[in-house]
Each structure stands twice: as C-alpha cells, then as structure tokens.
C-alpha cells in the first residue's frame, strides 16, 4: 500500500510540475482550454436539432453591424480625419466575426443578445470591423457560431459544428448580395472562425463568378489558411502588392521571439506582410508601420460559468501608436516585435507561447484602414 501511495504521489508531482511548466512558459491559456474542454465542454455527439432556429437575415436584430444603425463598429481612432460615410460609401464590407462563444453546454450559440457572447461580438465590431468604416458600409451578420470547444475535438466533430455555423454565414452573405449590395463592389473581411467560413464563401460562391470581379479584396485574417486552396481557384488569387484587386490577404501573428520554434503545418499557410502588403514579405522595419490601436472594451475569455452579459463598456478608440513594430513572414507565419511590456502585451500573450492571435487586427489597425481605402480607390479608378 505504501508503495502504491508513493507512486501516486510521484505521478501527482510530475503532473503538477508539468502544469507549472506550462504556466511559466506562457501556455497557461492552452492548458486552461484543454482542462475546460476535457471537464466542461458540451456533450457528444453533436446534434444540430438541438440548436436554436436559424436566424432570418431580413430581421435587423440578426446583424451585429448595419450601416443604417449606429454602433461600436463606427468608432474611429482619435485624431483620424475619416468622416462618417456609413450608408453613403460606394463600397460595402461583409465582415464575418470570429469565435466569441467560449462557455456554455451547447455546441452552437443561442443567439441570445443579453449574453457575454454578444458582448464579445460587439468587441469584434469595435476592434476588428471598425478599420473598414473608412472605406465601406459595414455589414456583419450574427450567426450560430461554433463553440470554442469544437476546435479541440476530433476532425469529424469539428467539421460538423463549423459546417453547421457556416450555413448561417452563407445565407447571410446571399441575403447581403440580394438585398443590400445593389451591385456595389465589396470587401470580404474576417478573423479566425470567421476566416474559416469566409474561405468557403470564396471557394463556393465568389470564385469563378461575377462576384469575384466585384470583390475588391478579401482580408481573411487569423488562424489557418493554406496556400493550396487557391491552386484550384479560377478568378481569386493571392494579393502581392498594396493595390492588387480580386485577391486574398491573410496573416497569423506571432512574437518574433519564437521565430525559430518549429510549428508543424504552419509552413503551408498564406502569409501577407501588412507593412509591405507583399506575399511572403520579408523583414520590414518599423518606419512603414501606420499604427496600432489599443482595443476598446474587454474580450471575455472565461471558459465556464454563466453566459450572462456582464455590462462591458466600450470607450472611444485612442490615438494610433505609429512605428511600433517590425514584421516579417517566415515559413507561413507573421512574426512581429515582441509585445511584452507594451499596451498590447497582456492581450497578445493570452494564448501563450508567443501566439498573438488576439492582436491580428489591433496592432495593424491603421495599416488595414489605409490599405482598404487604397484598394477601394484603385478599384474605383479602374472602373472609371
């Protein structure tokens, strides 16, 4: 009995040492996600009949952003001269938001507007959709997004849940084209889970159709987008300059402190350097960096407990911080100056291990804003 007890104590010590190591190396969030997924995720199998009714996109309540309605997506960084063009811009943006549904016992979001998930969606409007309000009328659907736990399941389950969520995004895009767009050019923009769905929109509804010629560009940022999906596309290419049109842009941001760390599978990803707008763009120093903008509000990352709203407030966006970072693409990832000790450090480090997933938009806010305007102007110039 004493021998068994000693073995159990030894195993426990090893587990605690491993846990401590993960936290000390900055991977505490990954450990937390793993633990929450194992102990508190939704039950299997995924049953789509348990989801709420599909949203009707003729109902304004099922849009997180509309140009006819004032919202946090209208915020402009302090000191920037862009005026309010919502409803009058010659170009639209269709923005697909990332995962904000991080807790709960269902695989897909309930569409409850009085929830922490909805507050996370508003965070995305304020800090990810807003860079496009200088060029475009902003449209962003709410949808029955996949729970964060779906990303930590076997591929079959993950694909089922994400595929279910995609059907809402597809219907929203079709409604947008048929009822809002009125033949105008548009930008497709997204982040993370939204990028997964947007890549399918490109493949299934845009490429090879007249929509590809109306699409100024696709800013499908964050997460994984492999180059090979563009091999079979007919009319959508990868952007390789600041003014290329009818093409896609993608990056996945990491600290340059981990640039020599081997990351399996990442080498096959698309990487656009947003300081040069070159595909696989090499090291670009700080001088072209147009400005990071500190995120407004709080993105709630709790993975358990109630999904009730907490009353998150959104202050006006602050002034851009210029020339703050350098950037380079290497082996499919975008590496930037380490953000430890900057206003972005805590947020950027939330995923651990040098992963700056949460900074894909904020640190390049002004670069995205100005490039979107530049591409729109190029499109309008070519269209006469």
Which stretches of residues belong to each language-model region?
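N-terminal low-complexity, Ser/Thr- and acidic-residue-enriched intrinsically disordered segments
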Residues: 2-118
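Surface cap/lid and interfacial helix-loop subdomains adjacent to catalytic sites
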Residues: 11, 26-30, 34, 38, ...
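Active-site signature of alpha/beta-hydrolase-fold catalytic machinery across serine-
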Residues: 19, 200-204
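Active-site catalytic motif of lipid deacylating hydrolases and related acyltransferases
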Residues: 29-51, 57, 97-184, 338-384
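Loop/turn elements at helix/coil->beta-strand transitions in domains of secreted/extracellular proteins
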Residues: 89-91, 134-138, 182-185, 212-216
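Structural recognition of the beta-strand scaffold that forms the well-ordered cores
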Residues: 92-95, 139-142, 187, 217-220, ...
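Active-site-proximal beta-strand/loop segments in catalytic clefts of secreted hydrolases
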Residues: 96-99, 142-146, 191-192, 220-224, ...
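Gly/Ala-rich beta-loop-alpha elbow adjacent to hydrolase catalytic centers
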Residues: 190-194, 198
